[in-house]
């Protein structure tokens, strides 16, 4: 099986993007792990698969696989690359598209010049939405860890996030605490662990230990989750610049019941073909 693909990234969060509309694609978890291997394959944080939409009125279906072979519900940086990919490949002439994901419909828009904006949908905060095992809904929760308790906010952006505030994101023990939060028993389906430093009301610095992928240079849904948690706690304004290790994105949220809008870069690195 020969597969044509594009290698892309959003803020250094890198992807192998495959057109499953014009070519037949059927990949096993083992094949995805091989493709994701940076020594033996293409190498990526996530594999993004473009498929035909299942329902009338939508443009495409968007599927995401981590480099461990597991399928996940959502990827914000990938959504921006998705919007650029379908335009560049001639799969659509639209700038704004409606895309089915495992957790609902999102609306990416390619703005040109390597920039895309995505309506990420309305965030959810009930513990059952992640899921997260808690007695009641709250703004923050105390999570017991081997290193001691930490205070987290939670949000679902179609995928689950736990966000904790830190004084210095560079000094945050992401490699140690990230896996402990990701696999904590309180998160039966695991969780993405965010570490947020608030610079001011319109600016944060962020690192994310992603479920199934480890720490990446940036996480779009993690940026959305961090900002909405900060806004709910009264710490941030409605428009926030998020500084990740891979670069900056802008997150906007008008409050409860409103969608989160994410704007940032989408870059094509190269195109290729691989035989499996």
UniProtKB/Swiss-Prot annotation:
Quaternary structure (record): Homodimer.
Pfam short name (any one): DAP_epimerase
Substrates-to-products reaction catalysed: (2S,6S)-2,6-diaminopimelate = meso-2,6-diaminopimelate
Listed GO CC annotations: cytosol
Location in the cell: Cytoplasm
Keywords for this protein: Amino-acid biosynthesis, Cytoplasm, Isomerase, Lysine biosynthesis
Name the record gives this protein: Diaminopimelate epimerase
Organism: Chromobacterium violaceum (strain ATCC 12472 / DSM 30191 / JCM 1249 / CCUG 213 / NBRC 12614 / NCIMB 9131 / NCTC 9757 / MK)
Active site: 75 (proton donor), 219 (proton acceptor)
